[in-house]
């Protein structure tokens, strides 16, 4: 808290303001007297009370299992891109329903599993915690398919990333139509990491690209390069940033590699990669 008294042209003004994240020291500005009173910071955030009615239902869409044509790996969804947004939604008081492109059991990308021998995601205690819950494992084992979904039943849509979407989302007309239905109705419409591949071709009902005139993000070329070098091979069949920058009339942006970065442009919400899922969910 900073109290400032200004004396100028024989008129005295008193100003009390709150400064966040910085301290300003001013001296002898028109007779200014500065009193540093305190540097108090407060954080208050709603957390839904256990057992209270939900605020609505959010649809999360993941890739059905696939096999990478580049690496031969079994692929699907990235754990943190499901669990971190899921935690945000649940704590905010929303019910979540998980569906997939084809329905049925889902495949977790190996490197995203916190129990994987590689140790790549061993730090992901949020995913590890969900994996101990029977209801969560039941949800992964039995998803509805897209054709069973009525957008009117949900308040928002969130596309889960992973390696699978590079094969199952891009050019998926059924998913494009579903996502556009949410978007055109004004509902929050989100995609994170490789699930943003859908936006390379998705169109609105007037035939225009959904990202026309929009600022958005997705997995960066620099991040693809890092991943390729880490495993010693090319992992993805194409790169989202490279493809997005070929599109006229859209603004694709990325931040520092693997930093948490999300953008809301109207009701279109995008997150850069696996570390951006919670940030994107907060924007929903």
Per-region residue spans from a language model:
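Extended, subdomain-level signal for the structured scaffold at the beginning of enzyme domains
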Residues: 4-185, 198-284
């Amino acid at each position: 808290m900073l109290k400032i008294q200004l004396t100028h042209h024989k008129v005295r003004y008193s100003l009390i303001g709150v400064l966040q994240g910085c301290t300003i020291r001013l001296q002898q500005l028109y007779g200014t007297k500065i009193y540093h009173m305190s540097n108090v910071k407060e954080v208050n955030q709603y957390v839904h009370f256990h057992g209270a009615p939900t605020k609505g239902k959010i649809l999360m869409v993941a890739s059905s299992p696939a096999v990478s044509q580049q690496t031969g790996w079994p692929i699907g969804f990235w754990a943190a891109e499901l669990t971190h947004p899921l935690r945000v939604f649940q704590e905010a008081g929303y019910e979540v329903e998980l569906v997939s492109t084809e329905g049925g059991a889902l495949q977790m990308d190996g490197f995203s599993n916190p129990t994987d021998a590689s140790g790549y995601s061993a730090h992901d205690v949020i995913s590890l915690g969900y994996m101990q819950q029977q209801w969560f494992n039941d949800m992964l084992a039995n998803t509805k398919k897209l054709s069973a979904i009525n957008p009117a039943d949900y308040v928002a849509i969130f596309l889960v990333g992973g390696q699978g979407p590079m094969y199952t989302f891009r050019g998926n007309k059924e998913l494009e139509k579903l996502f556009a239905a949410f978007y055109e109705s004004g509902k929050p419409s989100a995609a994170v990491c490789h699930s943003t591949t859908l936006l390379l071709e998705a169109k609105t009902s007037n035939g225009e690209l959904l990202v026309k005139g929009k600022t958005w993000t997705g997995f960066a070329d620099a991040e693809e390069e890092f991943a390729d070098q880490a495993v010693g091979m090319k992992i993805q069949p194409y790169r989202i940033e490279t493809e997005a920058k070929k599109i006229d009339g859209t603004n694709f942006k990325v931040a520092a590699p693997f930093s948490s970065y999300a953008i809301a442009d109207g009701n279109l919400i995008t997150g850069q990669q696996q570390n951006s899922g919670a940030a994107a969910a907060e924007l929903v």
